[in-house]
Every structure is written in C-alpha cells, then in structure tokens.
C-alpha cells in the first residue's frame, strides 16, 4: 500500500515539481555557504587577527542578514499565493513593498554596524580585534542592502517557478567573491593589500553583482515584462506593506530564536573547554552545510503550498506536503548514514596537524557528531514543516513554538545534561535532540490542524 502511494503518478509528479524547485535552491544555498567558508579560509591564511576579526564582524553581519530575511520569506508566501490566484498586480505590489520594508530595515541596521566597536568592547572582546572587526563592518554593512533586496527578488523567481536564475546569480556572486578576496585581502596582481577590509569590500561587491544579474534577468526576459515590477516603484501601498510586516516579523523572531539557540550552545561548549568549542565549530559547520538540503526543500514547500493555497486546492497541498516530507526523510537518512559510518573522515578534513590538541578535538568531534546524526531527522522535519506553515501564512504561533522549543526546552536541557548530569559536549547536543524534536512534533500537529481547517480531512494521511 505504501509503495503504491509512493509510486502513484500524482506523487511522482509532486516529487518532480519539488525537486525542480529545490535542487537549484539547494545549490544556491551551498554556494552561499561556500562563500562564507572561503572568506574564513583566506582570512586565516592572511593572519590570525584578521581571521578573528573577520569571524566576529561576519557573525554580526550574517545575524542581521538572517533576521532581515524573514520579511523576504513573507514575500515568498504572499507573492506565490498571488501568482497561484492569477493576480499579477498583487505580485508586483508585494515585491515593491518587500523592497521598501527591506530598505527601511537595512537603514536601521546601519546604526549598530556603524557603532560596532564600542558594542564589541562592551561584549568583552579584545580591543585590537574589536577595531579590526568594526573596520570590517564599516565596509560590509553596505552589502546588506543588495543581499536582502536580492532575497526579495528571489521571492518573485520562486513565485514564477524560475529557481535556476537564483542559482546562477548566487553562484556567479560566490565565485566572484573568491576571486575578489584573492585580489583584495592579499594584494595580488597590483591590487592594494587590504586584509579584513578587502574581505568586506569583496563581500559587498559580490552581493551587488548577484543583484545586478537578477535585475538583468528581470529586465531582459520577456516572460517577466507583463508583471511591470518597476512600474510605479516609488508608490506606497499600505495594506501590502502591513501584510508583509505582520507575516514577516514573527518569521524574523523565530529565526533569531533558532540562531541564538545554536549560539547559546557554542557559549556552553566554550565553558567546558577550548577543545570542545573547536569540535563544536567543526560539527556545526558540517551540519550547516547539510542543512542547506532541508532549507531548500523548506523554501520549495513554502512556494508550492502558497501557490496551491492561492488556487484554493487543499488536496494539492496535502500531496505536495507528503512528497516533500518523503524526500526530506530520504535525505535525512542518507545524511545520518554518512555521519554514523564516517565520523573520523568528516572531522579530519578540518584538522591539519596530528598533535595532542587536534587528537582531543577529533575525539570530541566524533562523539558529538554521532549525536548530530540523531538530531538530523528532527532538524530536517522542523525546517520543512515550518516552511509549510509559512506557506499557509501561519507565522505567529510557530514563532511561539520555536521560542519555547529552542530556549525553554532545548537550551535548558543542554545545560542540565552538560553540567548537572556531567555529559559535557554530548549533553549539549542531547539538548539539540530534545529541543528540535519538540519543535518538529509541535509543528507537525500545527500543520495537521491548519490542513484540516482547509477541508482536506483530518490530515491523518500525512507521513
């Protein structure tokens, strides 16, 4: 019976449609991650101080970018819904107001980045590193505008099911960033040697290049011209602005809750010892790369479900959600298998010299990677289920669920297992399993409830 369901023509078509959306998105997500990874590698080869300052500055920049992306995710849901309802004028309004709210957000966020040095000093950071990190942000902060506006236009391409454009623009931007880093950090081929400042300039220019490529597609491709995206671009539409804000701010808050959950875990790993913190950094880097798969499926889910909701088709929503959950399960099982079979090989990639310190990091890393294998299933499902709920324009209750799951349940359990029970790093990761598991279960039942209200039965056939 299960095999017949999996091989039914409708399910296969749902797989095909989902993968056509998700694969380019996964590719663009990975390209973006590789961009940050190469920044770290090149700054590390320049100097230890440059690496520390670059990581500190980039952490603030990425945090602000992730937070602001909540509004662009809201635009994905609203624009896809409007496209599904064949309301092209609403797509245009949502993109326009998405740009407005994004630009306003960026201007506000210039303030903490402009005055970042005293903030770093208040956080107890080294004065010399704080000065370098602040210098990084003075140049990187202008890249927040193209980085987030790019995400708004990404919503348009997803609504029209044209994800390859997103992949192409992101990939070209990431490749350019590597080349620009080589020129500007080290001063190769006659360019000035700028160190940390060079990495920031390269990042800003690469974001701008990716945005320009997207704009070129919007202007040159005939299929996009009827939407007249830039017609009356300065006109304000209050109801669309409110819709994006009301749907988007809970997404921003949920993303802050999740990001700070893992940041809090890093602090606890540092309390244990330096080797545990280093091992955690490696394992989280591996998990972050893998998460791009689940994140791509989540974006695909948001887009497809929003579009089906616009067509008022709850049966299609159930078909899509089942297909994505099944693909997600397959992906998670492959990742879990790799983590369980090759923990030493995965950790060793990040360690060069064979010393007592690196062997300690390797030993701890292998242990916590096994725990990471077990939370993959929950991490995968909470990501896509959250995407489904966003597709149904349900963001406030999921935000509350996220805050409770990650902080009240997850961080508390991590602390208890690590320090009261004495499990150290394994205890911190045990909290990940509990927190992410709690979130995925609540998101699942929330989605079933929302689905049943759409008239598709009780949602009991969901995987």
How would you describe each model-predicted region?
Residues 1-22, 79-145, 193-249, 305-374, ...:
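Short alpha-helical transmembrane segments in multi-pass integral membrane proteins
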Residues 20, 43-62, 94, 128-132, ...:
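Interfacial/gating helices of multi-pass transporter permease domains
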Residues 30, 34-52, 120-127, 183-194, ...:
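Helix-terminus/linker motif at the lipid-water interface of multi-pass membrane proteins
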Residues 26, 30, 34, 63, ...:
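Generic alpha-helical transmembrane segments of integral inner-membrane proteins
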Residues 20-39, 139, 173, 206-210, ...:
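Transmembrane helical elements of multi-pass membrane transporters/channels
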Residues 9-41, 45-46, 59-74, 78, ...:
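N-terminal transmembrane alpha-helices
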Residues 51-110, 114, 147-161, 165-166, ...:
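Small-residue-rich hydrophobic transmembrane alpha-helices
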Residues 72, 140-158, 166-174, 199-215, ...:
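Short runs within selected transmembrane alpha-helices of multi-pass transporters and secretion channels
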């Amino acid at each position: 019976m299960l095999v017949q369901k999996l091989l039914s023509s409708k399910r296969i078509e749902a797989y095909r449609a989902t993968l056509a959306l998700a694969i380019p998105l996964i590719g663009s997500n990975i390209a973006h991650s590789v961009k940050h990874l190469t920044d770290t590698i090149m700054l590390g080869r320049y100097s230890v101080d440059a690496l520390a300052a670059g990581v500190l500055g980039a952490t603030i920049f990425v945090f602000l970018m992730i937070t602001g992306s909540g509004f662009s995710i809201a635009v994905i849901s609203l624009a896809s819904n409007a496209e599904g309802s064949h309301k092209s004028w609403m797509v245009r309004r949502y993109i326009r107001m998405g740009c407005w709210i994004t630009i306003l957000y960026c201007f506000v966020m210039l303030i903490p980045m402009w005055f970042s040095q005293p903030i770093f000093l208040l956080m107890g950071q080294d004065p010399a590193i704080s000065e370098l990190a602040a210098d990084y942000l003075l140049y990187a902060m202008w890249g927040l505008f193209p980085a987030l506006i790019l995400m708004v236009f990404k919503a348009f391409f997803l609504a029209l099911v044209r994800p390859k454009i997103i992949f192409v623009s992101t990939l070209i931007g990431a490749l350019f960033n590597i080349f620009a880093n080589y020129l500007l950090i080290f001063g190769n081929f006659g360019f000035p040697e700028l160190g940390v400042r060079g990495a920031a300039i390269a990042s800003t220019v690469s974001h701008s290049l990716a945005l320009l490529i997207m704009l070129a597609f919007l202007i040159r491709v005939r299929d996009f011209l009827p939407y007249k995206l830039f017609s009356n671009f300065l006109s304000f539409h209050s109801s669309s602005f409110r819709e994006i804000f009301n749907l988007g701010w809970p997404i921003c808050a949920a993303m802050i809750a999740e990001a700070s959950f893992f940041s809090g875990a890093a602090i606890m790993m540092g309390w244990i010892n330096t080797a545990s913190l280093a091992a955690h950094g490696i394992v989280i880097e591996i998990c972050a790369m893998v998460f791009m798969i689940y994140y791509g499926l989540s974006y695909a889910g948001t887009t497809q479900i929003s579009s089906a909701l616009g067509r008022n088709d709850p049966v299609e929503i159930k078909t899509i959600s089942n297909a994505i959950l099944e693909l997600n399960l397959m992906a998670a099982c492959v990742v879990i298998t790799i983590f369980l079979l090759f923990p030493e090989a995965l950790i060793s990639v990040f360690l060069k010299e064979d010393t007592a310190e690196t062997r300690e990091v390797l030993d701890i890393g292998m242990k916590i990677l096994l725990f990471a294998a077990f939370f993959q299933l929950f991490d995968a499902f909470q990501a896509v289920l959250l995407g489904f709920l966003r597709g149904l324009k349900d963001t406030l209750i999921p935000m509350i669920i996220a805050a409770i799951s990650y902080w009240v349940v997850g961080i508390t359990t991590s602390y208890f297992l690590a320090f009261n029970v004495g499990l150290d790093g394994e205890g911190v990761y045990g909290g990940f399993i509990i927190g992410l598991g709690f979130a995925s279960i609540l998101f699942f039942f929330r989605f079933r409830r929302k689905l049943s209200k759409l008239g598709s039965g009780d949602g009991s056939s969901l995987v």
